[in-house]
A protein has these predicted regions:
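Macrodomain-like recognition of ADP-ribose-binding/processing modules
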Residues: 1-164
Length: 164
């Protein structure tokens, strides 16, 4: 079951903070922009991953769709993971870039990860993940999250920033 919060997702007590990224190595709008400022090492690693993938695949970036890369970060003495969910191949303005199948695969990968770890971890997602700059439909994305975590015993947090 999803639990909704209002405020800054980075004030949460989540063990994992998830956000959607594209497969092109462009990281800077939406919550990714906040992450870039707060945790520049996450953006650096993301760029390395996408560049290596592009080089190894002959420029075919869509192979990253549905995958996840995660990195531990520290904020005010608290460690947690930032998880990049590769839920869109491209980016731009005025279009739908979210690939629902890919986002679903990535969310399921997060679910598998927390299940394997065997702890009742808290997993946080920004409200309307994949729906702002990526143009997705929140009803569809919310259905993906609900179907993936319907029986999860830990907490799944949805954070709506006060400015939204």
């Amino acid at each position: 079951m999803l639990k909704y919060y209002s405020g800054d997702i980075f004030t949460s007590d989540a063990d994992i903070i998830c956000h959607q990224v594209n497969c092109q190595g462009v990281f800077g709008r939406g919550i990714a922009g906040q992450i870039k400022k707060m945790f520049p090492e996450v953006e650096k690693t993301y760029r390395i991953i996408t560049k290596q993938w592009q080089e190894q695949s002959g420029g075919i970036t869509s192979g990253l769709l549905g995958r996840v890369s995660a990195q531990p970060v520290e904020l005010n003495g608290r460690w947690f993971l930032i998880a990049n969910l590769y839920g869109q191949d491209n980016y731009g303005k005025n279009g739908v870039y979210t690939d629902y199948k890919a986002l679903s695969q990535a969310v399921n990968e997060i679910r598998d990860f927390v299940d394997v770890r065997g702890k009742l971890e808290k997993v946080a997602f920004p409200y309307r993940i994949g729906c702002g700059n990526a143009g997705g439909d929140w009803d569809k994305v919310e259905d993906i999250l609900n179907s993936c975590f319907w029986d999860y015993q830990g907490e799944v947090q949805i954070w709506k920033n006060d400015s939204e």
